[in-house]
Amino acid sequence: LMDLFLTQNYQITFLSTATISENSFDLNSKNIQFQNIVLNDNSFDDLIKKLSPEIVIFDRFSTEEQFGWRVSEQVPNAVKILDTEDLHFLRNAREKAFKQNKNLENSDLVNDVFKREIASILRCDLSLIISEFEMNMLKNQFKIDEKILFYLPIFAEIKKSEIPFSERRNFISIGNFLHEP
C-alpha cells in the first residue's frame, strides 16, 4: 500500500505507537519518515496538525478508534481511510464458530467487534476491502454504502518458483501460532 502511494509521489510519514527495533522494516530505504506516537496524549494533536496530511490511513479499526477523532479535530479536511486488511468481526465470528465446532451463522457476526468495526467504517471516508466476499457482505447484508468501500485485493507480487511444486522440500514455518485462523 505504501508503494502504491510512493508511485503517486506522496510524501509518507509512518506514525506508530510501537518503537523501531532491529527487526523493523527499514522505512528509510523507501524514503518514508517515522514518528513515534503515544496513546491518549495531546502530543499527537500537535504532531498531526503540524504534518497537516491530505490523507490519513488507519491500519485497523482499533487504530481509528484511538486516533480518528483527533485527526478529525486537528485536520478536518484530511481524507480518512481505513485499511481493513480483513474484517476482524468476521474473523472473530469464524474463530468462535470453529472452536464450537459449528457452522457460521449470520447471528454470529453481530458482536461487540462488529459494532466497533462497522462504526469505524462509517466514520471513515473510505475503507479498503481485500475480499470480494467481505465487500458483498458489507454492501448487501449490512447495507454499507458502496461509495465508502473500495475493493482492493492483495496486490503482492507473486514470483514463480523454478522448482515444480511436487519437487519442493524442507519448508519451515517460524512463528508463535498466536494469530487465530
What does each model-found stretch correspond to?
Residues 75-80, 146-147:
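A short helix->loop->beta-strand "cap" motif at the edges of active sites that frequently abuts
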Residues 60, 84-86, 131-133:
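Helix N-cap/beta->alpha junction signal
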Residues 66-67, 114-146:
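A short, active-site helix/loop in glycosyltransferases that binds the activated sugar's phosphate group
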Residues 42-51, 162-164:
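Short amphipathic alpha-helix with an adjacent loop that forms part of the alpha/beta core around
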Residues 7-39:
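N-terminal strand-loop element at the rim of the active site
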Residues 82-111, 166:
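Acceptor-binding helix/loop patch of EC 2.4 sugar-transfer enzymes
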Residues 48-66, 81:
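Short N-terminal targeting/anchoring amphipathic segment
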